[in-house]
């Protein structure tokens, strides 16, 4: 894989540090730390640039905060100058690395957030119903606390050969004591999580290259056939078995060529497929890959099921022909609206205060729910937006004098 080695010169530019300040302070100019930094902006940016060039910048001590929604998580917070330094490096590195990420990686990638992830799943389920009857959903057990430092450094070196930059990134990684662990809460931590898993995405797409090893193909083909026979329950299963051993063998080898519908949102992996027996083998391979290549653990609460029962991922529950919102999010919205109504607030004010949850829920098929809550916000047609209305009655014709008075 081709590597790039001339990042430091592009990073150590005053224009880049001004850009980094803009990114780090976006929508936060009211904070005291940013106001103080901005009061002597030229000197502060020059000091950060100098410390990067000379390798004297050291990550500040973390402050910690525990959040409990949606689950308990320890957030590591750094002073504002650290964020500017991180952004200065990311301005040059992020886009270069993003080109290496799988097109089916969502979350933390510009233009590919949770809603793009949701739209992709909806599109695939409707376009390929026969090939997406079943699903596998899994994630990493305590991802951030178990990130392995040597593995992360190795992943960075697959694309970067600028030793000066690598030493700066290594210092940030090692600012967390021990050989494992990373604190969410900074843009750079989010970027590191993407780098950590980007090779996994490509290997997963190719079924971890099992098809390239004849011994593994023979072993897993035998297991696939045996488990297909042992788990057959429906008429469709028995119909497939009646086609013979050779048919099952060829079908399994065809599956090994490529996983067409696999997606990742943060550390959540979703695979849509037509065969649950094959998915049970895939989850075994994922667990082995995590343990051997990434030194992390698979969450034992993985799930394989039928799409008709609903795929609960990214805050939504996907079905073949519609999308519902996760019950937890629906209940949270209902309770928030009930609390605001008790205060006697008008609907417009309630809609404004609950706009975040309403906006999230609107992406699912929830028009009935919003109508019951009195929070419906119908989307206007283009004609309504620009004020065009149909003209009723006859159109008045110009008189002869008006025609004669018109010149070309």
Task: Go through each PLM region and give its residues.
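A common structural junction motif
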Residues: 287-296
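Active-site-proximal segment of RNA-dependent polymerases
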Residues: 3-7, 90-148, 218-219
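Conserved polymerase palm-domain catalytic core
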Residues: 44, 51, 124-266, 270-285, ...
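Right-hand nucleic-acid polymerase module
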Residues: 78, 87, 213-257, 277-281, ...
């Amino acid at each position: 894989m081709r590597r790039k080695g001339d990042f430091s010169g592009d990073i150590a530019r005053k224009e880049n540090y001004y850009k980094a300040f803009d990114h780090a302070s976006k929508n936060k100019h009211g904070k005291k730390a940013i106001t103080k930094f901005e009061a002597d902006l030229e000197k502060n940016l020059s000091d950060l640039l100098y410390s990067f060039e000379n390798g004297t910048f050291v990550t500040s001590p973390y402050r910690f905060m525990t959040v409990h929604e949606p689950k308990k998580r320890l957030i590591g917070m750094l002073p504002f100058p650290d964020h500017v330094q991180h952004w200065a490096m990311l301005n040059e590195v992020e886009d270069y690395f993003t080109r290496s990420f799988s097109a089916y990686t969502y979350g933390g990638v510009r233009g590919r957030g949770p809603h793009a992830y949701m739209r992709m799943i909806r599109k695939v389920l409707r376009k390929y119903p026969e090939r997406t009857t079943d699903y596998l959903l899994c994630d990493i057990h305590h991802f951030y606390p178990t990130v392995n430092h040597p593995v992360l450094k190795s992943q960075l070196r697959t694309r970067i050969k600028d030793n000066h930059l690598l030493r700066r990134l290594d210092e940030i990684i090692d600012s967390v004591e021990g050989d494992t662990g990373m604190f969410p809460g900074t843009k750079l931590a989010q970027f590191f999580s993407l780098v950590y898993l980007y090779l996994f995405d490509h290997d997963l797409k190719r079924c971890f290259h099992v098809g390239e090893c004849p011994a593994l193909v023979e072993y897993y083909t035998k297991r696939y056939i045996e488990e297909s026979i042992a788990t057959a329950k429906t008429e469709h299963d028995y119909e497939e078995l009646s086609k013979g051993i050779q048919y099952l063998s060829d079908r399994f080898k065809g599956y090994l060529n490529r996983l067409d519908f696999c997606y990742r949102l943060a550390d959540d992996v979703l695979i849509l497929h037509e065969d649950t027996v094959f998915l049970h083998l895939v989850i075994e391979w994922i667990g082995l890959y995590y343990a051997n290549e990434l030194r992390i653990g698979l969450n034992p609460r993985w799930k394989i099921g039928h799409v008709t029962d609903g795929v609960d991922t990214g805050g939504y529950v996907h079905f073949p022909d519609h999308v519902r919102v996760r019950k937890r999010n629906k209940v949270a919205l209902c309770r928030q609206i009930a609390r605001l109504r008790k205060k006697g607030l008008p609907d417009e004010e309630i809609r404004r205060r609950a706009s975040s949850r309403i906006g999230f829920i609107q992406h699912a098929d929830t028009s009935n729910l919003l109508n019951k809550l009195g929070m419906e916000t119908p989307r206007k047609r283009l004609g309504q937006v620009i004020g065009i209305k149909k003209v009723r009655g006859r159109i008045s014709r110009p008189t002869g004098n008006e025609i004669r008075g018109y010149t070309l």
